[in-house]
Regions:
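Substrate-binding clefts and catalytic carboxylate motifs of secreted carbohydrate-active enzymes
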Residues: 46, 61-65, 121-230
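C-terminal outer-membrane/trafficking sorting elements
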Residues: 230-255
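Active-site regions of enzymes building and remodeling cell-envelope glycoconjugates
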Residues: 104-112, 128-129
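Active-site mouth of glycoside hydrolases
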Residues: 1-106, 124-125, 149
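A polyampholytic, Gly/Pro-enriched intrinsically disordered region
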Residues: 112-120
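Flexible loop/turn segments at secondary-structure boundaries
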Residues: 17-19, 71-75, 101-103, 116-117, ...
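Residues at the C-termini of beta-strands that transition into short coil/loop
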Residues: 13, 97, 111, 133, ...
Length: 255
């Protein structure tokens, strides 16, 4: 469906455990070392990650593989991210989204709630600077939430449509300065409400769009009019560079 819309996607690998039974499994944002994962764990986790890539790699809408998220089960970062880079050199690799960057992969990715503040690194090589999560303004519309009897939250609670429009508009405006400094992407939390979280732009039942689409379009269009920092080609395509590509069927036969 994303392919039919022309929607570009980032595909995350899931975290390596259901819950953090041991605190060292969740790497602290300021930690200088990764989790020393058992060999059996990292072997199984990598097996499932490469199976995911093999299963989904034929969908051109996927532009980026995301390996680790916010320190959850983060282990052997440099080794694993470099493996993914070699395994699929046709896509961008976001080695660590949020928190514990190890200087590997195509992106430097920071999470910040609810504001857009971000210190862009001065010496980042050719890595892309990304605000991988921000915002999270929560407006609970009671008739349209998953379970009204539980806590429904956002990173900052908002009361009503006008307050949300004003707050969201300020966030988008604040991105303009970062783009001029070299910010390449920003991911708002989030598209829809989910179980227990009401920070979506659309309600859980998909019946209410909290900010009118036309207004969102006007807000976002300003971001594309800003002159960014100098662009750098990281992966050549058929029109730019010398990347050779082949079209093959699912059984590996060239078309």
């Amino acid at each position: 469906y994303a392919d039919s819309l022309g929607l570009m996607m980032w595909q995350d690998m899931v975290s390596g455990f259901a819950t953090s039974r041991k605190k060292e499994e969740h790497v602290n944002p300021l930690a200088t070392t990764d989790w020393n994962a058992p060999e059996e764990h990292t072997r199984q986790w990598q097996k499932e990650m490469f199976e995911m890539i093999d299963r989904l790699r034929f969908y051109p809408c996927i532009t980026t593989w995301v390996v680790f998220n916010e320190g959850w089960g983060q282990h052997n970062t440099v080794e694993i991210v470099n493996k993914v880079i070699k395994y699929d050199d046709t896509r961008l690799i976001n080695g660590v989204t949020g928190w514990t960057d190890r200087g590997v992969g195509d992106m430097y990715d920071v999470h910040n709630y609810p504001v857009t503040s971000m210190i862009l690194p001065e010496n980042n090589g050719n890595r892309i600077s990304v605000l991988g999560e921000f915002g999270g303004y929560g407006w609970a519309i009671k008739e349209h939430i998953w379970n009204p009897n539980m806590r429904n939250w956002g990173y900052k609670n908002i009361d009503g449509a006008m307050a949300l429009i004003d707050s969201y508009g300020r966030l988008v405006y604040d991105l303009e300065t970062l783009i001029a400094q070299g910010l390449s992407a920003a991911v708002y939390t989030q598209t829809t409400d989910v179980e227990g979280e009401v920070n979506g732009l659309i309600t859980y039942d998909r019946k209410v769009t909290k900010i009118p689409e036309g207004l969102l379009h006007l807000m976002h269009n300003r971001l594309y009019e800003i002159t960014p920092a100098k662009a750098v080609t990281l992966i050549a395509d058929g029109q730019n560079g010398s990347k050779n590509t082949r079209l093959v069927s699912l059984n590996g036969q060239e078309l």
